Amino acid sequence: MAEEESVPKMVAPEDDIREIHSRLDEIERRLDFVWGEVYQRFGKRIGRDIGILYGLVIGLYLCMLYILLGVAFR
């Protein structure tokens, strides 16, 4: 029979594995913080743009009312 091929195995000390996991956890925590800040800034920018649009629409609506009511009551 042919020899069975096996996947090479490696055994690492537990201390090294714990150290690697702690480093990966720290990197993940930093990435979560950075992406949270990025999305928060993006949300603020979108909110500002929507507020500007609402302000313009309400301003135009008030101008139209002023013009229409001003002409009607002359």
Curated annotation (Swiss-Prot):
Cited InterPro entries: THM_MeTrfase_su_G
Pathway, per record: One-carbon metabolism; methanogenesis from CO(2); methyl-coenzyme M from 5,10-methylene-5,6,7,8-tetrahydromethanopterin: step 2/2
Catalytic reactions on record: 5-methyl-5,6,7,8-tetrahydromethanopterin + coenzyme M + 2 Na(+)(in) = 5,6,7,8-tetrahydromethanopterin + methyl-coenzyme M + 2 Na(+)(out)
A Pfam entry, by short name: MtrG
Single GO cellular component term: plasma membrane
EC number: 7.2.1.4
Organism superkingdom: Archaea
Family from the record: Belongs to the MtrG family.
Name assigned to this protein: Tetrahydromethanopterin S-methyltransferase subunit G
Species name: Methanopyrus kandleri (strain AV19 / DSM 6324 / JCM 9639 / NBRC 100938)
